[in-house]
Amino acid sequence: MAAVKTPVIVVPVIDRPPSETFPNVHEHINDQKFDDVKDNEVMPEKRNVVVVKDDPDHYKDYAFIQWTGGNIRNDDKYTHFFSGFCNTMCTEETKRNIARHLALWDSNFFTELENKKVEYVVIVENDNVIEDITFLRPVLKAMHDKKIDILQMREIITGNKVKTELVMDKNHTIFTYTGGYDVSLSAYIIRVTTALNIVDEIIKSGGLSSGFYFEIARIENEMKINRQILDNAAKYVEHDPRLVAEHRFENMKPNFWSRIGTAAAKRYPGVMYAFTTPLISFFGLFDINVIGLIVILFIMFMLIFNVKSKLLWFLTGTFVTAFI
């Protein structure tokens, strides 16, 4: 009997074809196999069902989608996802990335999935790489059996954890641990009804403030949501910080420092990703990242100690125009 496909949704955070998130499976899927879904659209009918018994590679289990809705640059209708404070002080990148996910959860697409009794959706931002998706089938079954609402597939905090067996078979040994404030939307599997309930609660509460991850954790506690984090997640979903770091430098005003930063991102991706991470918005006028904060602190140091070096002030000025 034909079964409803599980959607695998690629969320664009950089300029990159969706098939590059799955680099080793071009014989199965390519860019033409991805259906673009925008705001107010639903899944194309032709990809709703499939016979899965004869597919050892598992790719026929899924409907591959690229989500193109939730773009706050093109529309201000997503401001209700954020409080007035966050609309002023949260960085554009933070709001843009969160809005893409919340708009997806709040979309006609998810409502249709609920009506069609689709239980789970796999969501992956396109700065990740998944080389082998065969782990998804046993994971989805285990999530159903163990009543897991969200499986986060990117680890934020490392250290000792109390791990629980999720899948144990001849091909996969997978463990998880319970999530806390270490929330990430980079890659995850979510129950459709859970996504709808979370976004409904966010809207009813007046939108997210600057403490997004604390608020999501609070909502999870209040709604008794079971969020697990995939142990050793990088084995299954590889996040490439170089892609985002390069994207940030490419979107800066072209100058000497942006070219230096782009080159440095290739050699030191983790460091440059951290340095270019936006921290706060200055009343919506511009965002301040880690490098910008260091520059501001350095300017305060020079003012306090009355530094008169013209060279230092010149170099500081070039940093200000580049990173703030």
Swiss-Prot record:
Membrane topology reported for the UniProt record: Single-pass membrane protein
Alphabetized InterPro entries for the sequence: Poxvirus_P35 (IPR004900)
GO CC list: membrane; viral envelope; virion membrane
GO biological process, one term: virion attachment to host cell
Stretches of the chain found on the membrane's Virion surface side: 1-284
Topological domains annotated Intravirion: 306-324
Signal peptide (UniProt feature, chain positions): none
Keyword Magnesium set for record: no
Membrane spanning stretches: 285-305
Main location group: virion
Function: Envelope protein that binds to heparan sulfate on the cell surface and might provide virion attachment to target cell.
Family in the record: Belongs to the orthopoxvirus OPG108 family.
Miscellaneous: Immunodominant protein.
Protein name: Envelope protein H3
Organism: Vaccinia virus (strain Copenhagen) (VACV)
Gene: OPG108
